[in-house]
Amino acid sequence: MENASESPLKKYRRQPKVFFDLPSRGQFYTDGVLYGNTYTSLPVFSMTAGDEILFKTPDALVNGEATAANIRSCIPSILQPFKLVTLDIDAILVSIRMATFGPNLGITHSCPHCKSENSYEIPLQKYLDHYNRCEYNDTLVYGSLIIKTAPPTYADFTEVQKKTLSYQRALNINAPKITDEKQRDKYEHDILVEIGKLQVEIIVNAVKSIEVEGVIETNKKEIREFLDNSELELIKALKKHIEDNTMHWQVPLEKVKCANDECGKENLVKVSLDQSDFFDLG
């Protein structure tokens, strides 16, 4: 007869291992993205075997589905991962790694001075602390214009990533196969034009409103038309504004010391949070 009592396996199911706050502080989210619109003390579960396999599937990484599926699995209070802003994605990935593999990340680095291979353990909590100290600058003042911006959503980011990859393949793989020089030049020119359009698209998508003389314009069509016909200096200012925010949110370089007694020099190392290798080894 089947035992109707609670399964003894229940207490061995995944439990939250980490709790963290979203660095964006929920600033850019509408109802339904986060459960209860809560962005603090989010519980993080460790990855399952299936989650880890997804991170090793190239197509799922490129289209963002691997990351989105892992977020749904490990942080169920995030209801719509593709509507997350990119400011939160790295902190989310760090917290999932901590919940799955522990608080440290092992890295190797070849000393540029003596060529010795060194191994280091990097505490990941420092990155969560870094993100929580960061502030997103959402305002650009350009002459009489007050421009409000927002970081891209994860959906926008993955779309740009897919297009960028397809253009790179076109230039590196398809173009060299064209034997006629004029046709090849035209093909490459057309691809470069598309890349230029993509860069403008990133800038346009970042602009949420433009205020002039006390009137605020939020209509995306009007904003696009205005920017398409604006002077180059405004576009450059917007591009710099976006790049400055991106740089501000990047993981700081790690200062490490070479373990070779004959060297012992300090080096700065950039730690990669790219999903393809960040989750490769525990």
Region annotations inferred by a language model:
Residues 1-282:
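Long C-terminal interaction/binding lobes of large macromolecular proteins
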